[in-house]
Each structure stands twice: as structure tokens, then as C-alpha cells.
Amino acid sequence: MKKSITILAGGGPAPGINTVIASVAKVFLKEGFRVIGMHQGYKGLFSHKPDTIEFDFAFCDKIMNVGGSALQMSRHKPKNEEFKTDFFVNNNVKLLVTIGGDDTASTANRISKFLAENHVSIQNIHVPKTIDNDLPLPEGTPTFGYQTAKETGASIAATVYEDARTSGNWFVVSAMGREAGHLAFGIGASCHYPMIIIPEMFNETRISIEKIIKLMISSIIKRKILGIDYGAVIISEGVFHFLTNTEIEATEINFTYDDHGHPELGNVSKAHIFNMLLQKKLKELKVSVKSRPVEIGYELRCVTPSAFDLLYCSLLGIGVHTLFNEGKTGCMVTSNPGGDIIPLYLKDVEDENGKVKPRLVNIQSQKTQLVFRNNLHFIHENDYEAAKQYLENPEDYDFLKILNWD
């Protein structure tokens, strides 16, 4: 029977998935392999009748530079009792290529172990994907899709900023980011937003809604002192991962709840929440400022990949073939800034519980500190006297004091 490889994608979309799929498929087709695409991720792989597509060169050439995913994706995480050998044996699968985040990679390792125990030998190689840029790749190596999402996000954010200038309003912008603030920071820094709020900046104090609102007001008042009546704040949605349910519920926003009793944050606009809370506080302070919410999220996930990600994803796809020929398995494929293909093993980035720790924004790096201390607008000691016309206690809105930074 002809040897084959199987490709599946898990989690949510990111620009460049089709480029990875096409690049992997082309190089294996060239060597005479069947290339089978699996719809619905792991849910499809272990279903009674998997929904598959067999790739040929013409189809790969068609999807290579297109956004979205030719393979329908799924967040399904199968239990061990769902595993079966049928599909792998019946199709003579020699390699399972998974595209996704850390959960997708960990599941691939579990499957590989199960197959080995049942005398079915295959390799599995993972292509790390997320627009959040939070997988623990080597320093300076982005996750694919991040650069495109940042570029598209910056275009939207720049338009929003121009609207603020034109209308004399403020905008509260929320950007995707599961726990890390890479996307919000990258977009905000690119557009010179006067306030950027990400989870990592609270490295010396606990994150709270009160502090987030004070940081926004600090920027608004500083701009008033400078004679600027407009602006924009960008907040990473990741801040919500560090708030308690009690504090989230205290916002008085109407939430739906999951089976575990947790507020379903995915059903509401984080920008709307923070804008409502900001307006409430501004009214208490008798500060007249109009603000509007803007959510930047799903618009970024299926856009056409940028030139950076087109090349990067092509290298990752070809890199899968390179690692396969080297006999590598149970690893992620990475490409360093020089274009070299390097395997990264999950065991080297997992904690003692087998969980992959997210890569956070390095808040102490020179790049980050340059942006926070020089590009943002906020109240500091020299502004106290001028700020008293708006705030009774300007010191409470001092950026450095709120964060407990030196």
C-alpha cells in the first residue's frame, strides 16, 4: 500500500495555516506519498467515518497564499478511550502532522504513544500556531500568524485612532490574547497609542479592574493637560484571566455561565465592559469625555498572510519534511531568524504537570520599557498640580505608583 501522511488542524484559525498545509503536502507529494487532510481535527480522526480530503499539487497551489484553513478545524480534545488504530493502519500512515497550539501538540504525543503500544509505528511532528505569540519558542522566533495579525490589527487600530482625532473622542480597544499581551502590545506600540494595558505590566502588583480604569484615566487627564482632547487605549483581553469571578461579576455586566459556573467571557465584548466601567468612573469624577468600544479579534484570524508569514510558513512546512527524514518525532518544528530548521521537544518546555507554560511579554526588556516609559501618556509627579483641576487626588492616578514601578 502507498505510504501516506495525515494533516489536521486544531484550535482556532491563524493566518498561514493554508501555507503550512500546502508546503507540507507539496514536498511529500513530490516523494510519492499520499497526503490526506483530516477535517474537524481530532474529532474527525477518531470518528466512525472520518471526513477527509486527498491533496494534489493543483489544490495545494490554489490554497497556498489564501487565509483561513482548507481543513475544517476543531477544539475537540479526545480522551484516551477514544483512540483507535483503524485509520492509521488502513491508510498506511507514516506521519501525523498537527497544526495548532500546545493542547494539539500534547494530544499528538498521547496518540503516538498509544499507537506504539499497539504496534503501529508513526512519527508525529507539530507546527506551532497562534496569533497570540505565546508558545515558548526560542527568543525572537514568533508563532506563525502573529506578524500578520499584528499588521492587520495595527491597520484597524490606526484607523480607530484617526477617528478619535477627527471626532474628538476616546476609544477603548480590546485585542485578543489568551494570557499574554503580545498582540495588544505590538498593535499599540506600532500605532503610538497613549495607553497600552497588558497582564505582564502588573508584575509588581495584583491586576484589578480598579487599577485598569485608573490607568486609562491617567492617560486621558495627561492628554488634557497637553491640550489633546482625543486618544485611544488598547487592552489585552488576557487581563481577564487574572481577575476573580467575584470581581468580574461586580462589573454588573450580564453574563451567561458555563457548566462549571464561570462567566462565559467569549460571549461578551471586553472593550464594551471596560468602556462602560470607564464612563461610570468619569461621571463620578465629573470629567467630560466621550469614549467608544472597539473589539479587535476574530477579524484577524482568517486574513491573507503577510509576506513574512508566507515565507515563514513555507519554511515550517518544508521543515516538517526535513525533520521526518531525520527520524524526528514528538517535536515541534521551528525556524530561527536565520531560517534554520530546529526541532523543539514538548518535554523541554512542559512543567511538572505536563502543561506548556505560555511565553509572556518580557516586561523588563529594553524594547518594552522604551515603549512604556517614552511612548505612553500618563500622569507622573510633575503633573500633579496641573491635574488637580480634574482630579482631587492626582497621585492615585500616577502610572508608576499604580503599577508599583520605580
PLM feature segments, named:
Residues 1-46:
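N-terminal phosphate-binding or glycine-rich loops at protein starts, especially the Walker A/P-loop
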Residues 4-12, 69-72, 94-100, 170-175, ...:
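Short glycine-rich or small-residue beta-strand-to-loop segments that form or flank ligand, phosphate
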Residues 10-12, 33, 38-43, 75-76, ...:
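Short, ordered loop/turn segments at secondary-structure junctions
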Residues 14-24, 79-83, 102-110, 133-135, ...:
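Short glycine/serine/threonine-rich phosphate/pyrophosphate-binding segments
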Residues 35, 87, 98-100, 106-121, ...:
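Accessory alpha-helical/coil subdomains and C-terminal extensions
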Residues 45-94, 103-105, 131, 141-151, ...:
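Glycine-rich oxoanion-binding loops at beta->alpha junctions
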Residues 248-406:
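C-terminal non-catalytic interaction/assembly regions of soluble proteins
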